[in-house]
A protein has these predicted regions:
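Residues in the helix-turn-helix
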Residues: 229
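Short, Lys/Arg-enriched anionic-surface-contact patches
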Residues: 178-204
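Sensory/regulatory domains in signal-transduction proteins
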Residues: 61, 65-124
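Juxtadomain coupling helices with adjacent low-complexity linkers
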Residues: 1-8, 21, 110-187
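DNA major-groove recognition helix of helix-turn-helix
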Residues: 234
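Structured interaction and signal-relay segments at domain junctions
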Residues: 16-77, 81-83
Length: 251
């Protein structure tokens, strides 16, 4: 397979199967990552879940894969909190061509917001005290398994720093990455030293921010540095990265 369209009928049938199997609370998206990243969605079912349509952009995780920061980008059964308060149970599978290059990805976002709330309700409703001798008769067989499958109930909490963000255009994704870099820095841009600004740029580079068209202009504006200075930072970062790669190979 060279492109997604070489097997387009199969992808369409697979998406239809998933759509009918999981119903309207499950969003299924097919991305063509050979396109402009601002318009990667080539098919989407139940797009109301993340408010996206055909022609919208991919998430920040796809940028990391294209940048090469993440070698094996497949992720299964992880939790994402959307900006409008939804809790999603998500999986992402990247699609490669015959040469092993990433050309697309298939994503599933199952809205579990209401079931998580119902789970919390049941915990409160079933609150009780039991004698230790009778504990085995009512507690789960594997407490560890039950705890491992518990999803945090506070959908208003801030997403973790490596969270996935769903957006209608790539500018929103870039702004999200800049905001995450700000959080990591922990201080206003005006107070950042040269070394801290380099780390700021290093983070954005690892996240694939510079794959976004005209991202350099926005990042220069945010850091209050010239384009010349920004490119000097990038040159330094990538030289260090290449040196580390060569050292690891020798070892």
């Amino acid at each position: 397979m060279k492109t997604l369209y070489d097997d387009w009928d199969t992808w369409q049938r697979l998406m239809s199967m998933l759509e009918y199997q999981f119903g309207s609370n499950c969003e299924i998206i097919l991305h063509d990552l050979t396109k402009d990243y601002n318009h990667t969605i080539v098919d989407i079912r139940n797009g109301h879940i993340t408010d996206r349509n055909i022609g919208d952009c991919g998430s920040n995780l796809g940028l990391e894969v294209l940048r090469g920061t993440v070698q094996e980008g497949d992720r299964y059964n992880y939790v994402v909190y959307t900006r409008d308060g939804k809790i999603l149970r998500s999986s992402t599978m990247f699609i490669k061509n015959d040469e092993g290059n990433v050309i697309g990805c298939l994503c599933i976002n199952l809205d579990i917001t209401e079931t998580v709330r119902f789970e919390e309700f049941l915990k409160r409703y079933n609150s009780y005290e039991i004698e230790e001798d009778n504990a085995q008769s009512i507690l789960p067989t594997s407490k560890k398994h039950a705890e491992a499958n518990t999803v945090p109930s506070d959908s208003s909490s801030n997403p973790p720093s490596d969270s996935e963000v769903f957006a209608n255009n790539i500018t929103e994704v870039l702004e999200f990455l800049i905001a995450q870099a700000d959080k990591r820095a922990g201080k206003p841009v005006d107070e950042l030293s040269r070394e801290e600004k380099i780390e700021f740029v290093r983070y954005l580079d690892q996240k694939g921010a510079f794959l976004v068209t005209k991202s350099s202009e926005r990042i220069c504006e945010h850091l209050k540095v010239s384009r010349f200075t920004l490119y000097n930072y990038l040159d330094l970062i990538r030289k260090e990265s290449n040196t580390n790669t060569e050292t690891n190979k020798e070892e």
